[in-house]
Amino acid sequence: MNTIERALMHALFVHLHHNIDQAVDFKALEELNRKVSQQWPGALIVGPGDDAAVFQMPGIEGYLVAKQESHCSPCVPRPYDAAATGAGGAMRDVTAMGARAIFLLNFIGTRSLEKEVLVGPCGFVGKCTCGKCKVMTSQERLDLMVQGLRDMCAVMDVFVIGGGLSTSFTDIVPAVVVAVIGKLITKEPLTKPAKVAGDKIIIIGKTASDGNDTLFRAGLVPEMRPAVALFDEERTTLEASLAAFQTGRIHACSDLGAAGIGAAVCESARYGGFGAKVDLSAVPVKGEELTAEEILICETQARMVVQVSPADADEIMGAIESKNGIAAMIGEITSDDKEVFEYRGQTVATIPNKPSKEILESLKGGD
């Protein structure tokens, strides 16, 4: 297990599930689902395990899609971008199911508004040693977070229909939680799991070196660079994705969020019972020299991956490009039980669908 494999597997099998029981009251959720299923049998069409939930509401024709997401820690160094990318990420999750986002609700929890907070790379430790941080009031930071949410909604034509605020938080990290609701535009919901061995994997959008949290924790980069909000690119990716969906030829789809291409491909293949082979050299990147691990794992915004049969690939690429989207074929689904990532002809990471007990213990123990 090399360093890149360790970083990606830690993200897949440990970090993405870390402390989730403290963020989600599973007993309350189970009870709520039980009550809903009793009152509206069969209402939940796609539940936990995919990018968003798909459900039916009595008296409303068609399917609704909803996603709730928190984006808290990134608000310490970059409150504006973090709030905007939290909203944009939830919107992409809704889009990935074959829907167009319509409404957003939000909740923000922060310190008392008159309290001072340190915003920047050193915000977590409370003392600036980098010279890049700024001291501001909690009110000023709140204003930035609210503006980030509003600006993303404005670009994406999503209505903010409600929100909540608490100023009783004492932690350095504020809480930013958004819920996005949309309407399905495809005949049936799109889902994350891979469907057919041999399907081509197409990426929409360009990759950069921001959103490198996973790499930073693994010691593969010297500085954490939170994801940057990409407003116009988000809108372009939205319209390009919807154009691809309307061909009716998409087999699987996933938003690129935490751990980037690596997580999206590995989860899709694993959930479908397949493997995958990806050429990272084929990934469109922004004009900087990215390393293989940055292309694989960085969480650059405004990206999506879809899977299609080889015969339909050109049609899908054309649909994406008709909306000025950037698209590239980067790999294919295989009948294997692992995901193989190559860069310039060399294998840089091989991720098993079922890591051994020893590997999992090593990841959890940080050995």
Residue ranges: model-predicted function:
Residues 2, 16-235, 243, 276-284, ...:
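Glycine-rich phosphate/pyrophosphate-binding loop regions near the starts of catalytic domains
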Residues 89, 148, 239, 264, ...:
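Short Gly/charged-rich anion-binding patches and loops
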Residues 224-263:
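Polyanion-binding loop/helix "lid" in catalytic or ligand-binding cores
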Residues 1-23, 27-28, 132-134, 152, ...:
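Glycine-/charge-enriched secondary-structure boundary and capping motifs
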